[in-house]
């Protein structure tokens, strides 16, 4: 029930120098290498969601995000690969014509800008626009923010099975990822539970919503996976709020320092919205613990360019 959009398996890399510096063993699942234009975690979810869109005979795909949304860019890209029309509902903000937004435009995506207030009721806006387009003969498939629903979560359920074949997952003390819309941590948690491993999944919240919101959402996503034939026992995950910094998509000075350090010491590029914050959180939580920790690099390199003034 998916189509193959990405380059898998992505490698797992041990960060020797940073592990020595911070006193625990840091391994990175390099999902920044899933593709080029489609790079990052979103394409794993889109393998399932685009499969369903094509199965239902869609001609047009709706999704949403910020102006520099990695998910919106990846959705536009895979839609064009399969001859579908991408319509991106993007939350208004500082418009910098580079990075993801530039790629959206090059891919010929139709962009509908919505205010932050309108974005809070994005499902209603989707419904209005969907009805208008379907009256004109289009068939619309709606993908939620981040591709984070029960079907999309199978992308990271499958990633767990992939990692099981790459390394001894049971030897890890934690798996860490950024949390932006909840689908990645849901899939990881479901996969670990399915394998009956006792490895906690720790999500570092980078949004303005609190951890209670995401705990509830992740549980609903995992519960909904039963509709597709997956039944799992109790999942072990947590979402922490302590490393969000000044706000969503606004890196703190500590985030910027971590981003630069990982680049200059290990040659890995993080992004200022998700992975730099999550990596900093991981370091603070596990410093000098001598534990084995697996970090999921969810990509986001194109988001660097719109924030160049904050980074140099």
Swiss-Prot record:
The modification N6-(pyridoxal phosphate)lysine is found at residue 42. Keywords: Hydrolase, Pyridoxal phosphate. The keyword Hydrolase applies. SUPFAM superfamilies: Tryptophan synthase beta subunit-like PLP-dependent enzymes (SSF53686). Pfam families: PALP (PF00291). Its EC number is 3.5.99.7. Belongs to the ACC deaminase/D-cysteine desulfhydrase family. This is Putative 1-aminocyclopropane-1-carboxylate deaminase. It comes from Thermotoga maritima (strain ATCC 43589 / DSM 3109 / JCM 10099 / NBRC 100826 / MSB8). The lineage of its organism: Bacteria, Thermotogati, Thermotogota, Thermotogae, Thermotogales.
């Amino acid at each position: 029930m998916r189509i193959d959009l990405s380059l898998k398996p992505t490698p797992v890399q041990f960060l020797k120098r940073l592990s020595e510096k911070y006193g625990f063993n840091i391994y990175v699942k390099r999902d920044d290498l899933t593709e080029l234009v489609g790079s990052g975690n979103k394409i794993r979810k889109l393998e399932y969601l685009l499969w369903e869109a094509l199965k239902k005979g869609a001609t047009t795909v709706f999704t949403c995000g910020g102006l520099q949304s990695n998910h919106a860019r990846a959705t536009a890209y895979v839609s064009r690969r399969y001859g579908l029309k991408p319509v991106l509902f993007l939350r208004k903000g500082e418009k910098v014509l580079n990075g993801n937004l530039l790629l959206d435009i090059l891919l010929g995506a139709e962009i509908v800008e919505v205010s932050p207030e309108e974005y809070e009721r994005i499902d209603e806006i989707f419904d209005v626009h969907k009805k208008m387009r379907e009256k004109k003969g289009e068939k619309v498939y709606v993908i939620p923010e981040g591709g984070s629903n029960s079907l999309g979560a199978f992308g990271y359920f499958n990633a767990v099975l992939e990692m099981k074949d790459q390394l001894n997952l049971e030897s890890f003390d934690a798996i860490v990822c950024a949390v932006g819309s909840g689908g990645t941590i849901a899939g990881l948690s479901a996969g670990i539970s399915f394998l009956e491993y006792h490895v906690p999944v720790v999500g570092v919240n980078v949004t303005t919503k609190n951890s209670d919101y995401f705990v509830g959402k992740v549980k609903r996503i995992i519960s909904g996976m039963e509709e597709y034939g997956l039944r799992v026992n109790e999942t072990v995950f947590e979402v922490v709020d302590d490393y969000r910094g000044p706000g969503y998509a606004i890196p703190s000075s500590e985030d910027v320092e971590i981003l630069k350090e990982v680049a200059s010491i290990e040659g890995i590029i993080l992004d200022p919205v998700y992975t730099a914050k999550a990596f900093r959180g991981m370091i603070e939580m596990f410093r000098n613990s001598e534990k084995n920790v697996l970090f999921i690099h969810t990509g986001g390199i194109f988001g660097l360019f719109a924030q160049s003034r904050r980074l140099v």
